[in-house]
Design a protein with these regions (language model features):
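Periplasm-facing N-terminal accessory domains of Gram-negative outer-membrane beta-barrel systems
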Residues: 24-120, 126
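Periplasmic N-terminal accessory/gating domains of Gram-negative outer-membrane beta-barrel systems
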Residues: 98-106, 124-232, 243, 249
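Surface-exposed extracellular loop regions of Gram-negative outer-membrane beta-barrel proteins
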Residues: 201-202, 336, 387, 445-449, ...
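Transmembrane beta-barrel wall of Gram-negative outer-membrane proteins
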Residues: 263-289, 302-336, 355-383, 424-432
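Flexible loop and strand-edge segments within Gram-negative outer membrane beta-barrel domains
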Residues: 303, 324-370, 377-378, 385-412, ...
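Outer membrane beta-barrel strand-and-loop segments of large Gram-negative receptors
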Residues: 409, 413-417, 458-471, 548, ...
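Gram-negative outer-membrane beta-barrel transporters
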Residues: 579-581, 601-693
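C-terminal beta-signal and adjacent terminal beta-strands/loops
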Residues: 634, 677, 687-711, 723-729, ...
Length: 788
């Protein structure tokens, strides 16, 4: 209770400080908005596009030049909305550009060519904010902006936490940013950066996981990106749950700019600018170092140790006159924590301790070359690696420490990808690609929870394996109102020759003004982690075998139908119904076992597995959103779903992520403070989340005592349900523009009411008892940011 009161006290002090900031200012400041207008399909510049700032008086605007570039100067600071129009193209609406005096606004706008039949006149269409950046997506796609990631309460500038506001998506109640989509395991998520698959981009990420407590990729580096929750376009493979397709923004290529942030989670610095004045090349670099130790010292958090992490990311863009455009991107992170658990009788006596270290790195090169005005080719080479290692120590009967668990997992990859895109005309576009991944691994794990020196060796292998993927997309716009996207994805895991041929189809039909009916179907599959294929199974006679080397691919067929209604220019309604049939799912090779690998959130299994499982997910999702307009927005999402698996024993049970329902309500408003200069803004945002608790398996106390380790009662596999989870997040921010800088102070509090729902139970090896695990408690984060 003492820690909780300290958190509340700090939050109230920070809130009071925000509300009492400020001297008046009568000076109005201005900034430049500039960018490039290109064809969405061919990526060629659009000449003569008209760009206006909506509701400006007098009207402010300009037109794009021969290279598609535009510039609007002397734009007053604040929020603005852009309208982009060009003869022969759909209008493009770009809302909520935050114009600050400390940083230019640089954007790239992609426009879609109109399909006009002979005799048609006065065709007008507008692409809105919620539509996917990927023109091949017809259903279950949502674009997320960096501005939303920063604005939504409780996100901590983490895009993985931000997408939990979308219908059908929830995060881990225990504090991690694991993404559960439509009842599927977070392991089914695909992370992509700059068009290429990357490993889990989170700090403190365990083997086989897709999430973590802190994202290593700072949102200050991101451009608008896509998130997909089902029936993915043909170019996406090696995923059955969801796809996070992230794009890095391009640094300012005309002037140097700097951003500094300091908060409870970390201190970071971003710099960007041109390599040479008058040239079009640019760089963007961000470095961050953790500051959680401060909160730990204040007693505001208790991790049984101080988490330490640092990360760096960069994006270098080098256009050339005749050889196309080159870009180099990278992400690196290092994290670790030394945890100690002390005796209840003595605060100086350590009963157990663990040292957990992780690292990740990605470096890639993209080369895009325009073959014609309608076709381009993109080549990518990327190298990536991750390591997670840990030593967990306990005391034996004599009070001496022994190594109870030792892990060391190293995974590397080299990826080569080639993508060809051809916009044949306004109706037809073809996109095809080939991806080869060379996987390297050196993995080791052993455990002995009793301390007798008799270790169980569950992992000990090293080697290489290949993964081949290919795809073909065809987009056919039969009419302006009717679009078909068809294609096929192919995947072959060369380690055991498991392969999958995956047809995909999407349809988008505009019923009338602002009304769209869409449909998507497709087959999807995913390769398990190498640690699952090479896991060693210990037999009763003490011998080992590796029975999972020939394990096949887990597969899923997705069926989605959606309806979208643009109620007003600023509000829309979206509904989707879906059914997913999962098959070829890995389950324990025992007719009496209920075990299903897809119920795991991370890690691997040292059981003998076979592809005899199946499952089904179905549900209904509803979204009502009022875009940010006139300093106000709200978002309401709701999901009803059911997620079940059938193991080798033939019994259908809840999946481990079958919470059955999820809902979100987000609301926010900005207030101009003081005079008409609009240089000072107070923002207030809130988010309320309520979702069903996940099923869990109870522990067998006597068996756990005998093994000195948590032993689950498999006779009650996933039969208990965790408490429903209520979580309220709140943020308040104060932004002030000065002549050449923008300052912002923000307080962001997760679980402001400190609700404590029971999420799971675990065996405590120190107290030899079964304990309950609860949702993440209140967590305040204060952030100061300056742009100059």
């Amino acid at each position: 209770m003492q820690k909780i009161s300290k958190k509340h006290k700090l939050a109230l002090m920070l809130l009071f400080g925000l509300l009492t900031l400020a001297a008046k200012s009568n000076t109005m400041y201005f900034q430049t908005i500039r960018g490039t207008i290109v064809d969405q399909d061919s990526k060629t510049p659009i000449v003569g596009a008209n760009i206006i700032i909506m509701a400006s008086d007098p009207i402010m605007g300009t037109s794009s030049d021969a290279e598609g570039n535009f510039r609007i100067e002397k734009v007053p600071v604040g929020r603005v909305n852009l309208q982009v129009s060009c003869l022969g193209f759909e209008n493009k609406y770009i809302p909520n550009l935050v114009v600050g005096s400390g940083k230019e606004v640089v954007i790239q706008v992609e426009m879609t060519e109109l399909v006009v039949k002979l005799g048609d006149i006065n065709v007008v269409a507008t692409k809105n904010k919620e539509e996917s950046l990927n023109e091949m997506a017809t259903v279950s796609a949502k674009v997320f902006t960096v501005e939303e990631t920063k604005r939504y309460a409780g996100t901590f500038n983490d895009p993985a936490r931000m997408v939990s506001s979308f219908a059908g998506v929830t995060n881990n109640a225990e504090g991690n940013n694991d993404i559960v989509v439509r009842g599927n395991s977070p392991k089914g998520i695909l992370w992509r950066l700059e068009g290429i698959e990357i490993p889990n981009p989170n700090h403190f990420a365990g083997e086989g996981s897709s999430g973590g407590p802190i994202n290593a990729l700072n949102s200050a580096m991101l451009s608008n990106s896509d998130f997909f929750s089902g029936a993915f376009a043909p170019e996406y493979g090696n995923a059955y749950s969801g796809v996070f397709d992230m794009q890095l923004r391009t640094g300012n290529n005309e002037k140097r700019e700097y951003t500094f942030s300091a908060g409870a989670l970390g201190i970071d610095f971003t710099l960007e600018g041109p390599f040479k004045r008058g040239k079009t090349g640019s760089y963007l670099i961000n470095y961050r170092y953790s500051s959680l130790g401060i909160l730990d010292d204040l007693g505001l958090v208790d991790f049984y140790g101080v988490p330490k992490y640092q990360d760096v990311s960069f994006h270098v863009v080098l256009p050339t006159r005749n050889l196309g455009s080159f870009s180099v991107f990278g992400l690196g992170g290092k994290s670790g924590i030394l945890q100690k658990d002390y005796s209840d009788d003595s605060e100086s006596y350590v009963t157990r301790q663990g040292d957990f270290q992780t690292g990740l790195g990605v470096v890639g090169v993209n080369h895009t070359y325009l073959l014609t005005d309608h076709a381009f080719i993109k080549n990518t080479l990327a190298i990536a690696g991750t390591q997670s290692k840990g030593i967990y120590q306990m005391r034996d009967s004599l009070g001496n420490f022994f190594d109870a668990n030792i892990d060391d997992f190293v995974n590397t990859s080299v990826k080569i990808a080639v993508t060809y895109s051809n916009k044949i005309n306004a109706q037809h576009r073809i996109k095809a690609g080939l991806i080869y991944t060379d996987l390297g691994y050196d993995i080791f794990s052993k455990y002995d929870v009793i301390g007798n020196g008799n270790y169980t060796q569950s992992q000990d292998s090293r080697g290489r394996a290949g993964l081949v993927q290919g795809f073909v997309n065809w987009k056919y716009r039969l009419y302006q109102d009717l679009t078909f996207v068809s294609g096929i994805h192919y995947l072959n895991f060369l380690k055991n020759q498991s392969q999958s041929v995956e047809p995909r189809l999407g349809i988008d039909y505009q019923l009338g003004a602002g009304k769209v009916l869409s449909m998507g179907i497709g087959v999807h599959s995913k390769v398990e982690g190498i640690s699952t294929y090479d896991a060693k199974v210990k037999h009763d006679d003490g011998t080992y075998s590796s029975p999972n080397k020939d394990l096949g691919l887990a597969k899923a067929s997705h069926f989605v139908i959606g309806y979208k209604h643009q109620i007003t220019e600023q509000m829309y309604l979206k509904a989707e119904a879906y059914y997913q049939y999962l098959y070829n799912v890995a389950v324990e090779n025992s007719p009496a076992s209920p075990y299903v690998l897809n119920n795991e959130q991370q890690g691997w299994s040292d059981r003998e597995l076979i592809n005899k499982g199946k499952g089904r997910n179905y549900g209904l999702e509803l979204t009502v959103e009022r875009f940010y307009y006139n300093n106000f927005y709200f978002l309401v999402t709701g999901s009803l779903f059911d997620s079940r698996f059938t193991a080798f024993d033939g019994v259908e049970r809840n999946s481990a992520f079958n919470g059955k329902f999820a809902s979100n309500f987000l609301i926010g408003k900005e207030f101009r403070i003081g005079d008409k200069s609009k240089n000072r803004t107070l923002g207030v945002n809130a988010k309320i989340t309520y979702f069903g608790g996940n099923p869990y398996t109870p522990l067998d106390l006597q068996a756990s005592l005998d093994e000195n380790n948590g032993v689950y009662d498999m006779a009650q596999y996933l039969e208990l349900q965790g408490d429903n989870v209520f979580k309220a997040d709140f943020s308040i921010s104060y932004r002030r523009d000065r002549e050449k800088s923008t300052h912002e102070l923000k307080l962001d509090v997760q679980n402001v009411t400190n609700h404590q729902s029971k999420v799971y139970e675990y065996y405590d090896q120190g107290s030899h008892s079964i304990e309950s695990g609860y949702q993440w408690s209140i967590f305040p984060n204060v952030i100061y940011t300056i742009q100059f």
